[in-house]
Amino acid sequence: MIFLRDNVLLESELQLDHVKPRLLGHWGTCPGIILVWSHLNLLIRNHDLDMIYVIGPGHGAPAALAALWLEGSLGKFYPGEYDRDATGLRNLITRFSVPGGFPSHINAETPGSIHEGGELGYALAVSFGAVMDKPDLVVTCIVGDGEAETGPTATAWHAIKYLDPKESGAVIPILHVNGFKISERTIFGCMDDKELVCLFSGYGYQLCIVDDLDNINDELYTAMEWALAEVKKIQKAARSGNPIVKPRWPMIVLRTPKGWGGPKEVDGKIIEGSFHSHQVPLSKANNDETQLQALNDWLSSYKIDELLPEGKLADAIINTLPKKDEKKLGQLKDTYDPYIALKTVKWEDFAVEKNTDQSCMKITGAYLSKVFGENPTTIRLFSPDELESNKLDAILDHTQRNFQWDEYSRANGGRVIETLSEHECQGFMQGYTLTGRTAIFPSYESFLGIVHTMMVQYSKFVKIANEVKWRGDLASINYIETSTWARQEHNGFSHQNPSFIGAVLNIKAEAARVRHHPYATLV
């Protein structure tokens, strides 16, 4: 996909004019992504699961697109363009990373995606938000070991502590350790198994490490079956009235070489198992005969003629795919048409009488309390420990906080999650919204800037989603910004920063709105 503009089925020896004039894309992470995808197909097939695959290293789009073509999802959503035949395959490969084709990163045009694949660090929090209030949903989230160094990912490992297995689904995190970022070793790639077990046991997980390259399929199959069995055990206990206190959720550590299966060495540089495989391992294949031959040998090693005779799938591939189209990773309805509208509440019941003094936030809290009461499973509030300081505590009249590791707020159906990480709140909100529900994120003006770029990335996803014909409606993501520059009260200069509002205003009006309310009734 990165390389070819012709002869995509290798029906003859590659020539220089078969290779694209400009080579764009990322190869290094793709082997791990496609390995996990193939095993998830088998897991879904064997257990009839509702599953979403959230891919943290979204620059590995070639892996996702290849899998989506193989399972027929591209053909479903782009009929006549990317059908599961030789023409559809040629279109997919030759148009990749060029105008009019798929971009090099996963985005809203990618079936099955609920996460913009550019900025790293947010996949895990999005995954946990997606499974809240969806008891039958399992999200497998692959986190690259480079992405795992980010602050948002570091705090998102704690998200299991906010997941009630009685009412919600489950996330199976897979830490993909291939050892390298763009040009440097990763922290996790330099940790041994004991160090990884100690770290993630401290977070509250139990680990299965998959690293035997000679038996990788057997090991990964066993690991996934184990992880699913552990999930079901935790959920069964909670749903039968005997929840496990501080359950240790499963996660998998997958160790494979970066760029596994690609060229081992080019021009004296180690490629497979090094950072040199991160992007384009044969960057001169369009003008160098030696690299062209290396490309020919590499692509021929996959025996395309056996796997895709005349561009059609061999039975060996078909027999690993989910039997039902609606269960395929690219076709689960939760990822593209999930919207559940809220039951509305009459705002007039909360109107403030003329010439009276009222706190606009207290009135808002009372209104939201009623909304939460009318919508017990389709709305949540994610707050960075600011519910009461923002005078929204009336919400607690109809619901409670949800913190599963606290004996006083576990297993009570609480709709309010308070975690002192704006990144985690934003990630939860995105995942919850993109799977059809509605969420609210209240915070002080100066601190919403922490999620400025997350918000912008999300707006890109929504912009493209609105342009894609096969995606349905979604709720908005909703911020309540308080303690603004116009009304500081006791906080002062330290809490003045209108840049978040400015960032929202920079987004086109069809995608974003800012409302300034002069008095309580208008809130």
Give the location of each predicted region.
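Conserved acidic/glycine
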Residues: 1-51, 57-58, 147, 151, ...
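Short helix/loop capping segments that flank catalytic or ligand/cofactor-binding pockets
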Residues: 63-65, 76-78, 150-152, 182-184, ...
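Cofactor-binding active-site loop characterized by glycine-rich and histidine/acidic residues
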Residues: 5-164, 393-395, 423, 427-435
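Acidic, glycine-rich active-site loops and adjacent beta-strand->loop/helix elements
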Residues: 57-61, 143-150, 175-181, 213-214, ...
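Anaerobic metallocofactor- and corrinoid-dependent redox/one-carbon enzyme cores
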Residues: 95, 397-398, 406-423, 432-435, ...
